[in-house]
């Protein structure tokens, strides 16, 4: 810019010097002309007027140059101000970007803390005493986040307003100085060098304008990015609100599942204790049986007896008992399932009847009053009749069974979650009648007498008394289930009751009873 100023000064000086030379040359020519042509005063007047016109043109050029210099100084100062303001805005945007990063880091830290707190709360069984104490910390965190977001939004709005005001100032400045200033480069006064210098100045001004527009566009893009990031932050805050609202429901569900599992564990413990008690009783009964057999074997030395344990193994009896226990358990499961299905069918029927009654009532209410009384009487007569009652839970109709020490396989099967999990996590459980263990000692005496070897009254008419059978007929089952059960039972091997067996009278009664039990086990297999 100082080079351009020097060129303009040189142009003005050359113009002034040329005008002075022309004036001096005109004066000399006028003297010569006056010497040659004396008395011609009109030519002098014309020359004076031309000199005055030239001087006025020079003054106009000087005023234009001064005006241009003033505009140039104003442009330089405005460019400096704009560059300083743009740098300040860039610094502010950088600080805002750093603040946004810090806010995002805080949000990530809050997410991690919320996750850890949620996991800890799920692990804990007890809930807080009131909802206000539970949601106080979460509410304070959300309030602080919302305050920070509002402050950042206000800062962005202020920056946007300042940028808009500066853009308006630049527009007014351009309209004021550039539209009014239109220099004619084709005039004869300016030379080629001056026109080139003015073109360079215009190019520089255009470059400054382009740079300012680019910077303004960059600021606008940064503002758009900032608004997008704020929208993203708002979405994250909403997601956090939803997550915080869902946390108590998840904790309640977890506590309910924990309580259900605790109930199931307690039921399992009770069943295990009952099975242990049964095992202890069975071991005692086994010891009593062994002592009785030993007492029976200890007879006088005059009589020679055959030891039944040399050829016959007492485990055959236990195998028979195990198989019968399995059959009893299968029948019990089938009876329970059928009772449940009948119960569900009856409930559905009752629900449909209720829905039909409500629908009929609505239809009767829509009828005119003359017909309504007749239909209401019929409906009341039908409503007085009772609906079909629900089927009660099937109770165990057979006698309680003793588990022997050799039933390890059955104990492993019964300890599975399908058998021992009496309280399911859904809250549904089996009926107490079908799951309670009857530990009555008086009812077990009759069964213990059955487990002992059969006593033969007469050796001439010998009949073998078999073990207790599985209860086949249950009065609470429907006809279809009974037919299916009989079809399934026909496929299974049967025990023959009261079958006469020929025995050797030479053998003692204990050995004969063991042989009878072995024969019974063979028939069962």
Swiss-Prot record:
Composition-biased stretches (Basic and acidic residues): 479-494
Chain intervals for the UniProt region annotation (Disordered): 467-525
GO cellular component, one term: chromosome, telomeric region
Gene Ontology biological process: silent mating-type cassette heterochromatin formation
Leftover remarks: Present with 1910 molecules/cell in log phase SD medium.
Role played: Derepression of silent mating type loci when overexpressed.
Protein name: Anti-silencing protein 2
